[in-house]
Amino acid sequence: MVSVLHSISTIIIIAEFVWGNLSNGLIVLKNCLDWINIKELSTLDQILILLAISRISLIWETLLMWVKDKLISSITIEELKMIMFSFMLSSHFSLWLATALSTFYLFRIANCSWQIFLYLKWRLKHLIVQMLLGSVMFLIANIIQITITLEKRFYQYKGNTSVNSIQNEFALLIEMMLFNMTIFSVIPFLLALISFFLLIFSLWKHLQRMQLNSREDRDPSTKAHRNALGIMVSFLLLYTMYVLSLLISWIAQKNQSELVHIICMITSLLNPSVHSSILILGNFKLKQSSLCILRHLGCRLKSQNTPTT
């Protein structure tokens, strides 16, 4: 029974891996082609490209961590550190770019008369750049803290390159990484949550104005509000599941529960894979491109299956 569940879980992980690479690859490819043809990119397209690239990297790093048990006897402690730091880098930018996307939707769609809101809306691109540059400071602080802690605790493993030593070092890296990721993800998560509630407030005010004017609630502004809210809700839920899966995976690893670890791996891959698909469905340009690709593939398959006379 365990072997059957293990096989099913492996198939699901591979499917998420392929789907995540395809969906994020579509975002990168479509926007890069537009960049080549039009010679410019909007702020939204720039955020989407960087977010998709970071998620492709995160998917690969997550898969690499999943197979580390099979490679544990053939890799060094330094290589394990490289894997962990690459995972931290991808996860960091995936979170902050998604937060920047939520902020962009808030200021581009919401209608507020507050002076500070109007000022930030006017300087939206500058605000996004400052947010991402500020996040680099959090990333540097995170890496420095882990590096210092590792240097202090590494002496007990110095000169010991056995499998048990590497496993102990990997467990130590996992423990510190999860703790730091949880601490340093509080601020971007709160920013995304604040953007979500402010957008709800903006939608509520907009619907009130529509009712006072006896107009329908299917105008473009209402549709844009609901579309952005759907993207934000999916991001918040999927990222919460992602963090919880990392924590549960760490506990399962300490208790040597491989099945729970695999289930958590499936959950952690949902965030970079499924949310990118939701972004495609919520973006008219990307949605049309994906439909064109599907129609083209359907025609190719139909022509191949049609018998020739």
Swiss-Prot record:
Residues 1-7, 68-81, 149-182, 249-261 are extracellular. GO terms for molecular function: bitter taste receptor activity; G protein-coupled receptor activity. Keywords: G-protein coupled receptor, Glycoprotein, Membrane, Receptor, Sensory transduction, Taste, Transducer, Transmembrane, Transmembrane helix. Signal peptide: none annotated. The chain crosses the membrane at residues 8-28, 47-67, 82-102, 128-148, 183-203, 228-248, 262-282. Glycans are attached at N160, N180, N255. The keyword Ubl conjugation does not apply. It comes from the Eukaryota. Coiled coil: none annotated. GO terms for biological process: detection of chemical stimulus involved in sensory perception of bitter taste. One of its GO terms (cellular component) is membrane. Gene3D superfamilies: Rhodopsin 7-helix transmembrane proteins (1.20.1070.10). It is a multi-pass membrane protein. InterPro entries: TAS2R. It is found in: Membrane. The keyword Ion transport does not apply. Residues 29-46, 103-127, 204-227, 283-309 are cytoplasmic. Several bitter taste receptors are expressed in a single taste receptor cell. Belongs to the G-protein coupled receptor T2R family. Putative taste receptor which may play a role in the perception of bitterness. This is Taste receptor type 2 member 124. The lineage of its organism: Eukaryota, Metazoa, Chordata, Craniata, Vertebrata. The gene is Tas2r124.
